[in-house]
Design a protein with these regions (language model features):
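Non-globular, low-confidence helical/coil segments that flank catalytic cores
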Residues: 1-349
Length: 349
């Protein structure tokens, strides 16, 4: 009888534990706020009769209410996340958030959406994505999509492929993926990325430069059809390139690609990208290659890194620098490696 009662009690506990209303998430507050909250908790848990014991719980309020600083109107913040051999870039404006690509899936289990992107969204206090851009359907760019959709609602998506069809197919092929959208979560609106499509958010302009409307996939090459997005704020600009190659770069340059402060090096800095035309047209101050440590492709190619450096750009690479962050402000453009600015003991030295 006791075992039966225990089993029933555990059923109720498991049900409560899985309910959405049973827990909530808060943004990652600075350590002094956490220390203050822990001190208040220790005070509140003292024995009855301890002076002002219950007031200790009030010390937790700053931790629960803290929100990270957001950019001012016309400014933006970028996080080129460290997802290994793949791509995931978070762009924040004053009130909105955009994710460009969702990182790779790990065949040993898990994906970048679950392991990297969702925790970053939580740490930044982001409970909703206004825009999700999936540049193309390669798994190193879309492998974490279903985990992202399970973590936060997405108002609309842009992609160079049919996102709804891809999600259905992926659910059939990977039914056991954690957070895999068993409830069928999809973006509220799913659109194609097409050259000339543009919108504004908080004084920041987002414009697709590639592919052209109705353009067929070149030779069946998904890379060539990648969405290319330019982010233009009041002070600085950012170019997100997917996996386009030299041919598409030449097309962008011929169409009058404006100078750009930060460029995500196309195709992880492969030897078949970051051609002279793109490098010369962009005139970037910073180039970022998202690639995995000791990846089998040899990304980024040494010649590509030299090309950007010779053009005067600082060259960042996630296999060496980890996540690369940037903040565009009226006072200037601040770009840094998270690993260097906020070093942890588990980082190699």
């Amino acid at each position: 009888a006791g075992a039966r009662v225990f089993e029933l009690a555990m059923t109720v506990v498991a049900w409560v534990g899985n309910a959405e209303w049973a827990s909530f998430t808060v943004a990652a507050a600075p350590w002094p706020w956490l220390a203050w909250a822990l001190a208040g908790m220790a005070w509140a848990l003292q024995a009855p009769g301890w002076p002002a014991r219950r007031l200790g719980w009030l010390c937790m309020l700053p931790l629960l209410c803290w929100r990270p600083e957001r950019p001012a109107p016309g400014e933006w913040r970028m996080s080129a996340l460290d997802v290994g051999q793949g791509s995931a870039i978070l762009v924040e404006t004053a009130t909105q958030a955009l994710l460009f690509d969702a990182g790779p899936r790990h065949f040993g289990g898990g994906d970048a959406g679950e392991r990297v992107i969702a925790p970053q969204l939580q740490a930044r206090g982001i409970g909703r994505l206004d825009v999700l851009v999936l540049s193309h359907a390669d798994l190193d760019h879309v492998g974490g999509t279903r985990s992202v959709l399970a973590a936060v609602p997405v108002a609309r998506s842009y992609a160079s492929f049919d996102v709804a069809a891809w999600l259905r197919r992926d659910a059939r092929l990977w039914p056991g993926q954690d957070g895999a959208g068993a409830d069928g979560r999809t973006p509220a609106r799913m659109l194609r990325c097409e050259r000339g499509d543009s919108w504004q958010a908080d004084g920041v302009t987002f414009t697709f430069l590639h592919p052209a409307a109705g353009a067929p996939v070149a030779g069946g090459d998904r890379n060539a059809n990648s969405c290319v997005l330019r982010v233009g704020g009041a002070h600085h600009s950012l170019l997100l390139t997917g996996d386009i190659g030299v041919a598409q770069e030449r097309e962008l340059a011929a169409l009058g690609l404006p100078p750009t402060d930060i460029v995500l090096a196309p195709h992880h800095g492969s030897a078949w990208s970051s051609g002279r035309e793109l490098v010369a047209a962009a005139r970037a101050g910073h180039a970022i290659a998202q690639d995995g440590y000791l990846n089998r492709f040899g990304h980024p190619a040494p010649a590509v890194e030299r090309r950007w450096l010779r053009a005067g750009a600082a060259f960042w690479r996630s296999d060496r620098d980890g996540a690369v962050m940037a903040e565009s402000r009226a006072a200037g453009l601040d770009v840094w490696a998270q690993r260097a600015r906020h070093r942890r003991y588990w980082h190699g030295r």
